[in-house]
Amino acid sequence: VVFLLTFVVALFSLRLLSLNQEKDERLRAVYAAESTISRVSSQLNCYLAESDFIKKYIESGHVLREEEFAAISSNMQDGSSVIKTHELAKDGVVSQVYPVAGNEAAIGLDMLHNPARKKEANLAKNSGMYTIAGPFELVQGGTGALLFDPIYTYSKKGERSFWGFSILVLQWDNFIEEVELDKMEDAGYRYQIWKKDPYTGEKIVIAESEEDFPGNALEVACSVPNDTWYFEIIPKA
């Protein structure tokens, strides 16, 4: 009887230890996921801060000439080459681009009606919050994401009206490198970040570790403006 009781207590202790270890591992994984998403959001906010001068300039009622736009945008180009292009879209239609060379195909693109862009563009317009579209193939070539930042102007009566967008086109591979997702693998995790296609609801993989990803990972839902990103994470075997 004493042996049986000791055996039961030992099993219970092992099970309790296992549950505590699983809980600790889950908490560490959740923290790693949320910290990574926070780092992504912080980096996006840095890019937006760089374009904020142009946004405020337009909101104050000034007309931005081509040479002024080019001069300001040239100073926004970051050393890591994440910002591929800066675009202004008056009434949602791309009217100014920097640099022009290599990005001519983007001029005249109607973001509010383009089949691959309109969902996120209209979300940004209607909510007043910046919205990320992509990653996807860009009309000017390469893979990137669009950061729609809506601009509004006010009449003398204080009535607000939609002016258009300040749009940052991000080189996606450079952006992923900039936010240091490889640190997840260095910390001993495999991961996959994905979101739902706004048109089909299908899964779009935003980034993932190089190793094959299993189906029994912990999933953490993280909010970004006008969207939800899903972070699946699991310790390496």
Give the ranges of each region predicted by the language model:
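Membrane-interface helix-start motif
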Residues: 234-237
